């Protein structure tokens, strides 16, 4: 449906019988109103054409071929705003055959039936509104009560019976005689309340505002009573208060949505459009039909039998009528939700029929698979892998996916730069995948963000925007810090990529949806982009240095503490200059040349730090050179002094891993400071 703001939306709820009839009814030029399905047939076995007034009737649901009626006549399809044109002979409207995807019909039921979703689903809406046990209502609906108390507010024969205390035995023999009389229908409608009619009358008599007031008053009274001192009584009161809350919420919902409670009892049963329950011919001439067609046929057969019993046979026993009403109720229940009342209905091959609920619910249902999960233009899907070289706001897009998603923009770029004269030439150049194509694609992607989504999208961080970067391979590369928001890992997860087309969508992606704009959890405010799994292991390997090497001697207290049983031979140990590096670039260059390892300890020249100079820490070892200079070795640093005890230089003990981590943090801080300065 489309609201007044021209927003397309889908709303599920109860509708009135008038609305159901309005969905299906069409008025022919001769004044005949069509829309009711009265026959359980589908196609004629000889002509292979839809049966009139059947489940695939062309008069009700529209022509099978566009502009061709059941007689075979053809007429040009006019504009939708023009008056509809019908065939004078068969009554089929000359419209597009796609109307059979949304044109509905209806079945006029011989007796009201309750909607099984509102009766049997927990919590039961009908039981909550009527404040009656579900077992009692089920017995009433399925005619298990051969005798039910009257619900009419006027005096009845049964109310009169209750005022007498004598002749009780005679009533047992006299009342059943009424079930076999010709006037049983009138007697039953006035005196006996059974079936879905009883539920409908009670729901129609409800005043939702009075229910709200009374439920609120009772809820307050139960809260003021206080504990009863008995656990069983306290739990009973608690359950009653919870029930009253649910009842008030349900009444508010009916008032807010302008839905009448009696609409939960069906008098007209909608019939789905034929294209949503098709019959397909397979190899060998065999036909495959949707299970819903068979369930509809079952309803129509039983409903027609009930109508015949009520109209043609006036002397039909009342028990037979109630039994047939129960069969109609069960047939509608099976159509809506097969198996909700226990044993599901099966076909001749012992296969369970798929009801309407089975068609729409679940991962493979109509909503999740066809409406919500359907493929859309300008979208792709692939496996995600880690991209360690990416920034937080970037994602790696495979060339094969990128050239398809941005093909329209690349074509415009080729024509704009006069590299192609038309769209056909541009597409042929794209198929050749020359170097100029990738250059134009790079330019297009620089100014166009993409959206990444991982199902299920449970919160807003399930869809985030990224700046695409071309990568080799066929997998989408993702920064590991954003995985927590998507609840993703790199064990085969797949993600969908979408291209925002409109300027509004691109602005929303840049201002609100970029990954570096969503660093905190929207629910509790905790950081959402935190290192996990591989990143923690990598940080540990990067910063866990081999502490033995520089100070592996008897004077190092750290070695005595960690290796008490290992003896260092003083005769074989002589001091040699450990790797000394003037800057971090030399240290990283030595690592790349494989002169040192990632965790090899080294001395890195450091700026003169007053905290180190003023430290009162005693050196672990002091080495003297022949020229008089000395090397004072401390736990984490080394000081080189001249003959006059002046500090010449300071070296800190570190590893290549620590240096790499420090440089990454320093570059990140400098980039953040530059961004802040540009912003101001």
Swiss-Prot record:
Q: Coiled coil located at which positions? A: none
Where in the sequence is the signal peptide annotated?
Answer: none
At the top of the EC hierarchy, this enzyme's class is transferase
The compartments listed are: Plastid, Chloroplast
A GO MF annotation of the entry reads: DNA binding
Q: Which cofactor does it need?
A: Mg(2+); Zn(2+)
One GO cellular component term:
chloroplast
Q: Where does Mg(2+) bind?
A: 489, 491, 493
What's this protein's name?
DNA-directed RNA polymerase subunit beta'
Which organism is the protein's source? Citrus sinensis
Lineage at the top is: Eukaryota, Viridiplantae, Streptophyta, Embryophyta, Tracheophyta
